[in-house]
Amino acid sequence: MKRTFQPSVLKRKRAHGFRARMATVNGRKVLARRRAKGRKVLSA
């Protein structure tokens, strides 16, 4: 069986990047939660 994680920076940024998070209301909620928790890194 092949390894299922085949990294791609482009796909990672498009799916989980800061701009992707900011694009939707729920994404903004994700960022707000991570800020509230005190995460050093908010998004990919």
UniProtKB/Swiss-Prot annotation:
GO terms for biological process: translation. Pfam families: Ribosomal_L34 (PF00468). Belongs to the bacterial ribosomal protein bL34 family. The keyword 4Fe-4S does not apply. The keyword Chloroplast does not apply. Disulfide bonds: none annotated. This is Large ribosomal subunit protein bL34. InterPro entries: Ribosomal_bL34, Ribosomal_bL34_CS. GO terms for cellular component: ribonucleoprotein complex; ribosome. NCBIfam families: rpmH_bact. Transmembrane segments: none annotated. Keywords: Ribonucleoprotein, Ribosomal protein. PANTHER family: LARGE RIBOSOMAL SUBUNIT PROTEIN BL34M, MITOCHONDRIAL RIBOSOMAL PROTEIN 34 FAMILY MEMBER. One of its GO terms (molecular function) is structural constituent of ribosome.
